[in-house]
């Protein structure tokens, strides 16, 4: 049957139109060097019914962005709230520390009229006074007067004035800060910037403050020690360049020295084998 099939295909040479379909025969070698012909052509049946036996996956879902779930939205919102609360807490801590440093609260044992009674009730003041005035059996020395006990030794005492009574003279252990108190350069913004930089770049190694200060002083010292030249600068010209670096004579012809030689002429050459 093989030879008959080959002879049948040999009768149809090249390509032959069958109706409206163009069929092309391709010659191939099969097993045992047997010639075989393959037909490749477009079939209307295949194109028309291709969708019935071809799997078309729905690729649209792979291009749609995944929508966050309810749990993910809740966790994201919780994370934002915690971050905001942490920033507010840090800011409040810094501001509270600054206020407490500049304006310390009054002492609870102050004897002034406008001091402790504002913050503590009279019953508390009476109990505290009786407790302090009670003598101790183990003390063999005479007790110090209450007025001397309450007098501050380390804390400064500031004069107190009243707007309604100019003749009033009093003392207090605290006062509001003024512009004259801030004579030192502020370090709060620098420390805050360094802290923020450490949070942004946790893998970086920052030099200690002492090393940064020494580098700063060394750079300032080097800048101050550099002598300032009084020589007036002039534009660079070819004559000035020749004065600084004159033309040197080199072996060879004159044209070669000035770079106008078309070819190198070697008078004495030795060939080494």
UniProtKB/Swiss-Prot annotation:
It comes from the Eukaryota. InterPro entries: TSGA13. This is Testis-specific gene 13 protein. It comes from Mus musculus (Mouse). The lineage of its organism: Eukaryota, Metazoa, Chordata, Craniata, Vertebrata. The gene is Tsga13.
């Amino acid at each position: 049957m093989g030879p008959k099939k080959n002879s049948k295909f040999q009768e149809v040479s090249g390509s032959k139109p069958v109706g409206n379909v163009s069929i092309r025969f391709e010659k191939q070698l099969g097993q045992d060097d047997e010639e075989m012909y393959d037909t490749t052509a477009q079939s209307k049946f295949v194109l028309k019914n291709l969708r019935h036996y071809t799997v078309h996956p729905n690729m649209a879902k792979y291009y749609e962005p995944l929508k966050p779930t309810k749990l993910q939205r809740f966790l994201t919102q919780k994370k934002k709230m915690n971050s905001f609360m942490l920033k507010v807490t840090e800011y409040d801590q810094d501001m509270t520390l600054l206020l407490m440093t500049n304006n310390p609260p009054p002492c609870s044992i102050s004897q002034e009229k406008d001091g402790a009674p504002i913050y503590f009730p009279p019953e508390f003041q009476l109990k505290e006074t009786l407790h302090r005035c009670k003598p101790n059996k183990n003390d063999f020395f005479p007790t110090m007067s209450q007025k001397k006990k309450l007098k501050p030794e380390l804390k400064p005492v500031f004069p107190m004035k009243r707007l309604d009574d100019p003749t009033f003279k009093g003392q207090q252990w605290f006062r509001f800060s003024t512009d004259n108190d801030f004579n030192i350069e502020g370090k709060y913004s620098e420390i805050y910037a360094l802290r923020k930089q450490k949070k942004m770049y946790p893998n970086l190694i920052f030099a200690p403050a002492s090393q940064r200060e020494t580098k700063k002083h060394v750079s300032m010292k080097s800048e101050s020690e550099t002598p300032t030249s009084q020589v007036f600068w002039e534009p660079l010209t070819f004559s000035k360049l020749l004065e600084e670096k004159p033309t040197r004579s080199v072996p060879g012809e004159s044209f070669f020295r000035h770079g106008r030689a078309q070819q190198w002429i070697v008078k004495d050459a030795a060939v080494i084998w």
